[in-house]
């Protein structure tokens, strides 16, 4: 049964992340905790399915104020498949050098901020544009993706750089370059990608560690509560408080 094959591959990725990435998780968390303790931002960016970890972390039950999602609709909303905002346009834009620079012009950054970028391959120019602009503004850069699998691939950006080479900290998702992990008889291509579950695991490993570091420093966290629990009469108040805090902090971005 191929369901078990996929689960075995997913478990293998989780085990590799645990075995090899805890030190990187800790270093990334320390950088992010510095930003959030200063009431600054961890800006999060990705394109394609690498926007899923951005959307997973905030706003979300169990997430907390301090993470600022930079979601570009043409880079994430391509589920029409064809027609307007289709896959052809998306594939063009993620490889269009210069587009990421234009994205960055729409925000105000501070050197106390952190940039966190997600990319499976680290090759597409839009991510490298964003990374280069973040570094030029003095932001530390954390990158999460399949760094080891793409170490020997040539760069696509005119700078000659790949995303993982620009990072101050890389959290490797430990996913093979061929993301889809389950082969099928009589087919060239596999099914069953594992990068999304690896991204999600990396996100919560880092964020729970950020929370741990902030609590150790005495920083109050504005956490989004589980707001559908029977008997919890203050969840909506706590949610409203978190949203007010987000609104206050994001005003200058």
Located regions from the model:
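A short, well-structured juxtamembrane/interface segment
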Residues: 20-37, 103
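Glycine-rich phosphate-binding loops that contact phosphosugars or nucleotide phosphates
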Residues: 37, 44-207
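Acidic, Ser/Thr-rich low-complexity intrinsically disordered segments
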Residues: 229-253
């Amino acid at each position: 049964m191929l369901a078990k094959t996929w689960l075995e591959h997913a478990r293998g990725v989780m085990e590799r992340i645990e075995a090899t990435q805890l030190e990187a998780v800790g270093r990334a968390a320390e950088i992010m905790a510095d930003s959030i303790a200063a009431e600054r931002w961890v800006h999060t960016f990705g394109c394609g399915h690498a926007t899923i970890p951005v959307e997973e972390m905030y706003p979300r039950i169990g997430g907390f104020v301090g993470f600022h999602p930079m979601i570009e609709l043409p880079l994430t909303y391509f589920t029409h498949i064809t027609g307007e905002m289709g896959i052809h346009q998306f594939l063009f834009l993620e490889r269009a050098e210069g587009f990421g620079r234009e994205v960055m012009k729409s925000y105000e950054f501070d050197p106390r901020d952190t940039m966190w970028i997600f990319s499976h391959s680290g090759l597409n120019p839009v991510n490298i544009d964003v990374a280069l602009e973040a570094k030029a503004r003095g932001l530390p850069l954390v990158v999460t993706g399949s760094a080891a699998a793409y170490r020997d691939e040539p760069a696509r950006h005119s700078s000659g750089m790949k995303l993982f080479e620009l990072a101050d900290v890389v959290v490797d998702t430990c996913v093979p370059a061929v993301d889809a992990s389950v082969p099928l008889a009589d087919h060239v291509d596999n099914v069953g990608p594992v990068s999304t579950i690896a991204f999600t695991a990396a996100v919560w490993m880092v964020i729970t560690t950020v929370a741990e570091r902030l609590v150790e420093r005495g920083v109050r966290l504005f956490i989004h509560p589980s707001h559908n629990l029977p008997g919890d009469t203050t969840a909506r108040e706590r949610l409203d408080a978190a949203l007010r805090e987000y609104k206050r902090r994001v005003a200058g971005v």
